[in-house]
Amino acid sequence: MSQTIPQITTGPLPGSRKIHVPGSLHDIRVPMREIAVSNEPPLVVYDSSGPYTDAAVQADIARGLPDLRGDWQLRRGDVAPYPGRQVTAADNGFAEGARLTPAFPLRRDPLRAAAGRAVTQLAYARAGIVTPEMEFAAIRENEGRLVAHARDGAPMGAELPDLVTPEFVRAEIAAGRAIIPANINHRELEPMIIGRNFKVKINANIGNSAVTSSMEEEVEKMVWAIRWGADTVMDLSTGRNIHNIRDWIIRNAPVPIGTVPLYQALEKVGGVAEDLSWEVFRDTLVEQAEQGVDYFTIHAGVRLHMIPLTARRVTGIVSRGGSIMAKWCLHHHRESFLYERFDEICEIMQAYDVSFSLGDGLRPGSIADANDEAQCAELRTLGELTKIAWARDCQVMIEGPGHVPMHKIKANMEEQLRHCHEAPFYTLGPLTTDIAPGYDHITSAIGAAMIGWFGTAMLCYVTPKEHLGLPDRDDVKTGVITYKLAAHAADLAKGHPGAQRRDDALSRARFEFRWQDQFNLGLDPDTAQAMHDETLPKEAHKLAHFCSMCGPKFCSMRISHDIRAEAEKQAGMARMAEKFREGGALYLPVAESVAEAAD
């Protein structure tokens, strides 16, 4: 077994340590990252990295993360353990022998809702119950702040409180404007919230394929992605060993895990879309729900009459799930089983509190196809399905495009809010131009920052490998850092309270030539320091009042220091001169005093 355990990345980020903030309503400890800053109080920031960056924790992925939520669920008294379904050869793509990834060593009986009970965060919120998950998420959002901070921005309809309370979280979930993806079988989860009245979140995609990657790589990709700030992770595996790899990932994931169950269902029928059936798909939903998947992408909005609308597109149907279901619909000349059986899907989602991520199977795959009738028709259907899911106490977010030029992005957000009743929007980018293969993390981050400002709640990252290949570890980091930047830019534009604290702290460090603080306060300390040290590697250079860009004579900030010092010197001299003038008026020369006395 030891040979199969991946070497994962652990340890704090430079200049940082893990701290925990206690709850007041529930017995919880919420993790955050504290960054040490010279000559200033430390800066506390949101932290999704889990125990892997805690110096006091020895990670053992063969045991998985601690059971954080089990007691919460049992105290509620509305769940019941049961034996669960048996794992079949089809679950792992019929892999066998040396090709079969070992099963995760620990197995618990799965939980599901007790008869007649609703165990979703939406059901609790509607009943006025503030769960530990809700308080946990609320505390995270405040990033250690106890008081309001000055804010500057245009919220674009968002209602951002100075401080997020557990009651505010409950109310937003009850209204359908936010979700806490938290399958009752993902007991290791550190709960988080997705909604436009909270910090903009990001998702990282990982997953093996039929031609590359392994369990070792995928677990490390997950840990690596959350180290750099991924708030959720989607496992989009399409090759063999899907079940076992997913188990290893979930048991070691402190963040919500999402999937597209259709991919595994397709593997179970040999990759032939026409052979898919409701029975195979339903079995796959239950399988993944028992494992603890927190949200499912369900492409139920692809309807038969919409498919011809894509015929004249430049790039047709680019969603894998969308194309699979379109092919099935055309072959069987009927609506998809995802649409026809949506009520039954809701029953499964409700029993385990799996959140819906209603998929945009007809999203535009090129800017030429942006905002066309196929895209809009599907969006309207997703709005109808949202109401059906809400009626069954299921949490819902809506997936969005895709490829959209900048001038059409705002309309996407407005249409989503209108047709989907303010359910959280979750977008892939969007990519704002199609001319940059190898740089689509940049083309998409432009659109992501914009749509995040306009109201998107979560951004799905794009890596440099988009359209080119399966991302590796380095691509994952590049994608996550790029999207953390886009999400933070959106928070600043919206006027999120406290968002600018980190910018201001780094700006002060930059002006004062505190190089180590600059590195540590950045999104990627390692890369920042490596770039600095390429040309100024000596320790003495960490104290230098210049960098290699300008050198000592042309550094604008050094010159600004000189200007400030000179201005202060002149201001001081002016103050002294004023004092002398005041003194001259109080103490007249002797001759004048005698003359005045004689008069």
Swiss-Prot record:
One of its GO terms (biological process) is thiamine diphosphate biosynthetic process. It catalyses: 5-amino-1-(5-phospho-beta-D-ribosyl)imidazole + S-adenosyl-L-methionine = 4-amino-2-methyl-5-(phosphooxymethyl)pyrimidine + CO + 5'-deoxyadenosine + formate + L-methionine + 3 H(+). GO terms for molecular function: 4 iron, 4 sulfur cluster binding; carbon-carbon lyase activity; zinc ion binding. The keyword Transferase does not apply. Its cofactor is [4Fe-4S] cluster. Keywords: 4Fe-4S, Iron, Iron-sulfur, Lyase, Metal-binding, S-adenosyl-L-methionine, Thiamine biosynthesis, Zinc. It is an enzyme of class 4 (lyase). InterPro entries: ThiC (IPR037509), ThiC-associated_dom (IPR025747), ThiC/Bza_core_dom (IPR038521), ThiC/BzaA/B (IPR002817). Its EC number is 4.1.99.17. [4Fe-4S] cluster binds at C547, C550, C555. Catalyzes the synthesis of the hydroxymethylpyrimidine phosphate (HMP-P) moiety of thiamine from aminoimidazole ribotide (AIR) in a radical S-adenosyl-L-methionine (SAM)-dependent reaction. Belongs to the ThiC family. PANTHER family: PHOSPHOMETHYLPYRIMIDINE SYNTHASE, CHLOROPLASTIC, THIAMINE BIOSYNTHESIS PROTEIN THIC. This is Phosphomethylpyrimidine synthase. The gene is thiC.
